C-alpha cells in the first residue's frame, strides 16, 4: 500500500489513558513557581512510522515546534503496525486519544497524518499551509484560561481558578522528549527510510478533574532524564483545550 494519507474505521472509543493515583488537593500556600504567562497553541500530530504520507507531516510539525507560543506534540499510533512495521513510539492510549477527537468532532474515521489544534479543529498533516493557517487562527483566539504553575520542586503543578465548562474539565499530563528523534524504518511503506519526529510523546495520563477551583496535582514521578511534561486542561465534552503549559526550559 502506498498512499499519502490513511484512514481507519472502527468503533469510537472515549479519549483517555491510565489515571494517575496522585492526590489532587486545593492549592494552598504557594511556593516559588514558574509561570507561563502566554497562552500557547497546542498542536497534536497523530502519525505512524509505517505511513507513507507521515514523514512530510512530521516535518511540518517540526517547523511549527520552533515557533514561539506553540506546543507541538507527536503521538505515534499503532493501528498500522499490522502492515509490517511495529511503530517504535506507539502506545494504544495515543490511538484512544485520537478516537476521542474523532467522536467529539464527529469524524467518520481516524487517519494519519492528522493534526489537531487546541482540541478544537483538525486538518490533514499533509496540508502544510492549512496547518499553519489553523495555528495562526487559533493563536488569534484569546480567552481567559486558568493559570498553570509548575512548582520548583518539579513534582507538582497547580491549576488556578477560572470559569469551568459545563460538565467540567480534565487535567492531563503529557510526557515527551523535546527535540527531534530519528528512526530507521525496517518495514512497511517507509522501509529503508530514516523517519524524523519531534517532541515524541512517551506517556499520557489524566491527573484529575477541574471544576473551576484552584487545585494542586502530583506530576508523574517516572519521567526519564531529558524529558519534559505538558499539562493541559481539557473540556470533558467537546475536548477543547482550555489552556496548557510545558515545564520545558525556555
Question: Whereabouts are the PLM-identified features?
Answer:
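Ligand-binding face of N-terminal immunoglobulin V-set domains in extracellular IgSF glycoproteins
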Residues: 115
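Charged, low-complexity surface segments at secondary-structure and domain boundaries
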Residues: 83, 118-121
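Active-site-proximal cofactor/substrate-binding loop regions of enzyme domains
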Residues: 3-6, 13-105, 109
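Short, conserved sequence motifs used for protein processing/export or organelle targeting and
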Residues: 88-112, 120-250
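Short loop/turn motifs enriched for small/polar and acidic residues
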Residues: 75-78, 118, 153
Amino acid at each position: 500500500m502506498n498512499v499519502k494519507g490513511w484512514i481507519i474505521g472502527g468503533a469510537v472509543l472515549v479519549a483517555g489513558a491510565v489515571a494517575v493515583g496522585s492526590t489532587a488537593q486545593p492549592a494552598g500556600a504557594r511556593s516559588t513557581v514558574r509561570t507561563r504567562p502566554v497562552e500557547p497553541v497546542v498542536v497534536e500530530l497523530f502519525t505512524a512510522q509505517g505511513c507513507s504520507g507521515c514523514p512530510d507531516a512530521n516535518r511540518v510539525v517540526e517547523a511549527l515546534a520552533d515557533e514561539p507560543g506553540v506546543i507541538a506534540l507527536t503521538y505515534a499510533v499503532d493501528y498500522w503496525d499490522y502492515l509490517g512495521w511495529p511503530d517504535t513510539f506507539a502506545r494504544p492510549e495515543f490511538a484512544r486519544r485520537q478516537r476521542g477527537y474523532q467522536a467529539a468532532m464527529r469524524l467518520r474515521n481516524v487517519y494519519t497524518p492528522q493534526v489537531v489544534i487546541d482540541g478544537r479543529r483538525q486538518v490533514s498533516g499533509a496540508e502544510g499551509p492549512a496547518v499553519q493557517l489553523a495555528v495562526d487562527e487559533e493563536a488569534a483566539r484569546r480567552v481567559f484560561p486558568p493559570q498553570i504553575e509548575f512548582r520548583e520542586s518539579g513534582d507538582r503543578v497547580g491549576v488556578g481558578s477560572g470559569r469551568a465548562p459545563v460538565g467540567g474539565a480534565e487535567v492531563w499530563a503529557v510526557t515527551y522528549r523535546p527535540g527531534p528523534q530519528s528512526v530507521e524504518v525496517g518495514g512497511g511503506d517507509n522501509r529503508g527510510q530514516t523517519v524524523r519526529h519531534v517532541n515524541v510523546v512517551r506517556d499520557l495520563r489524566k491527573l484529575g478533574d477541574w471544576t473551576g477551583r484552584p487545585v494542586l496535582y502530583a506530576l508523574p514521578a517516572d519521567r526519564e532524564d531529558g524529558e519534559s511534561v505538558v499539562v493541559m486542561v481539557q473540556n470533558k465534552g467537546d475536548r477543547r483545550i482550555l489552556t496548557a503549559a510545558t515545564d520545558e526550559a525556555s
